[in-house]
């Protein structure tokens, strides 16, 4: 079999092509690591939080410069203001209790990754209509174009005792 270009490969270099965990970081003109400058960089570099415990999520966000406050949902909201005038937000929501359960995505403890213009944030909170929602990979999602929107933006957390049990 002769060598050559593989037209069916999924990436030019599968070892270096994708940085899904955001470990690469960003570098400035001098080659030093820097933080995200805009919402696209921040959302795409957030790690996957699916099935992580609230403690693991908090630790990761704290290390990235996020601050927390109480969310309107009764959970927590972690925010980080960015130089482009946007705020990155990660909401930790307790499960919604329904009797009988309807099988909705919010019936388990979950998180949301969202962005909102910084001028719309008050005391760490904002209105849902002002937010753009993202899936766990950091890609924007909306009801109009994604039939799996509700499931994609309700990222399940590992249940724990207390509020997120």
Which residues does each PLM region occupy?
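Short turn/helix-capping motifs enriched in Asx and small/polar residues
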Residues: 1-30, 165
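Catalytic toxin/effector domains delivered as secreted proteins or via bacterial secretion systems
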Residues: 24-165
């Amino acid at each position: 079999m002769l060598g050559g270009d593989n037209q069916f490969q999924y990436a030019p270099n599968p070892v270096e092509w994708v940085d899904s965990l955001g470990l690469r970081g960003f570098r400035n003109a001098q080659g030093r690591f820097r933080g995200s400058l805009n919402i696209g960089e921040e959302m795409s570099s957030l790690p996957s939080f699916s099935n992580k415990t609230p403690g693991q999520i908090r630790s990761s966000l704290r290390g990235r410069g996020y601050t927390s406050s109480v969310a309107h949902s009764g959970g927590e909201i972690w925010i980080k203001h960015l130089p482009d005038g946007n705020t990155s937000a990660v909401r930790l929501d307790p499960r919604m209790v329904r009797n009988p359960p309807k099988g909705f995505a919010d019936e388990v403890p979950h998180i949301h990754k969202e962005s909102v213009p910084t001028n719309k944030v008050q005391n760490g909170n904002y209105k849902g209509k002002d937010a753009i929602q993202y899936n766990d990979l950091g890609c924007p999602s909306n009801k109009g174009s994604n039939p799996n929107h509700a499931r994609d933006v309700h990222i399940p957390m590992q249940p724990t005792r207390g509020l997120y049990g």
